[in-house]
Amino acid sequence: MVYRIKVAGVERDLPLCPINEELNIGAFVLFGDVELTCKCAEELYKMAPEHDVMITSESKGIPLIFEMARQMGVSKYIVARKMQKLYMSDIFSCDVNSITTAKKQTLYLDGKDAEFMRAATSTVSILLLLARLVMDT
């Protein structure tokens, strides 16, 4: 079973994945899909409010945030990691729940990234924008 979707002018058939007995979701995967990634980034760039910082979790949002930063001429974006890394210091963490992950996850930011965010006047979450783009299409 598949669910046909049209996002940013690009059509794809998404395989349906069961979440529980009553709910299936279409697996929207950007990894490896250059056309879809570039088109979504272009549309999200148009939708994004004015911001100083872009952030995503260590997820399928990484190629998207990279492409958005490239198109916008931005030299930095932040990725909240799923595991602490040896190079991180003064780590900031928060617990999150995801529809595609059965249990609670913890995301981690290096202290320098957390400071960069604190200094910003506005931040945009790429994954929230992507959800809005998909729902509006």
Segments (PLM) and residue ranges:
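Structured loop/turn residues at beta-strand edges in well-structured enzyme cores
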Residues: 49, 72, 118
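Short glycine-rich phosphate-binding loop at a beta-alpha junction
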Residues: 51-58
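Gly/Ser/Thr-rich loops at beta-strand to alpha-helix junctions
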Residues: 58-64, 134-136
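Beta-hairpin (beta-strand-turn-beta-strand) motif
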Residues: 59, 82-83, 127
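Short Gly/Thr/Asp-enriched flexible loops that form oxyanion-binding sites at enzyme active sites
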Residues: 64-73
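Short, glycine/charge-rich flexible loops or terminal/linker lids adjacent to PRPP-binding catalytic cores
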Residues: 75-122
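Cationic, amphipathic, low-complexity alpha-helical segments enriched
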Residues: 121-137
